[in-house]
Amino acid sequence: YPIDKSVADGTTVPIYYEGRLIPLHLLNNYIDLDFDQLVAEHPIETKDTLRRKWATIEHAVGSDSRLQKVAYDVVYHFINRRLEGKAMLVTMSRRIAAAMYQIIKQMKDAPEVAVVVSGNKDYLGQIQEELDNKELEKRFKNPADPLKLVIVCDMWLTGFDVPHLNTMYLDKPLKGHTLMQAIARVNRRYKDKEGGLVVD
């Protein structure tokens, strides 16, 4: 069912897009050291292809300095938007989601935030105690609950309906069907909601 048709017949609200950019500042000497270790067993012909892919991996996206900038940008955008409702931040990995949670939680003006990921207790460390995904789902679906921002990587991107969710921050490459499913989280009708916003 095409999105434009669902908007035209009033089933959903339009989705608006706002492009934002937090650049990756990569130190080539560190990339090359890690890269050389990883591709030592690979044929020489594939090294150039692998080198291009290596530059965009989770490690670079999840650098502390970049996460600080993204967290500040998300919180600043969230508290200065004119929309009422809730927001979702989509990250590349559980590690990044957990790190982003710790950063945002410490910010003075940040909304109440939670991280919703699957994983074992050892991996998630201290935030696991705060995680109860069923309870978080109940809270996030309640428009009156102060929980305003959730950080996810894969969970809640499909089949999760929260009509008052109106902003999605994408910090993860998505494409095709997965992208369409994810951005459709913000186009549900709710009271006087005029549209959903995807910030990338």
Model-assigned labels for residue ranges:
Residues 146, 179, 183-200:
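Conserved segment of the helicase C-terminal RecA-like domain
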Residues 1-84, 101:
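Interdomain helical connector at the RecA1-RecA2 junction of SF1/SF2 helicase-like NTPases
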Residues 151-165, 184-189:
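SF2 helicase motor core recognition
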Residues 31-33, 103-108, 127-130, 165-168, ...:
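Short secondary-structure boundary/capping segments
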Residues 21-26, 94-96, 120-122, 156-158, ...:
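Conserved nucleotide-binding/hydrolysis micro-motifs of P-loop NTPases
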Residues 51-152:
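Conserved C-terminal RecA-like helicase domain
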Residues 1, 9-15, 84-85, 109-112, ...:
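Short glycine-/polar-rich loops that comprise or flank the Walker A/P-loop
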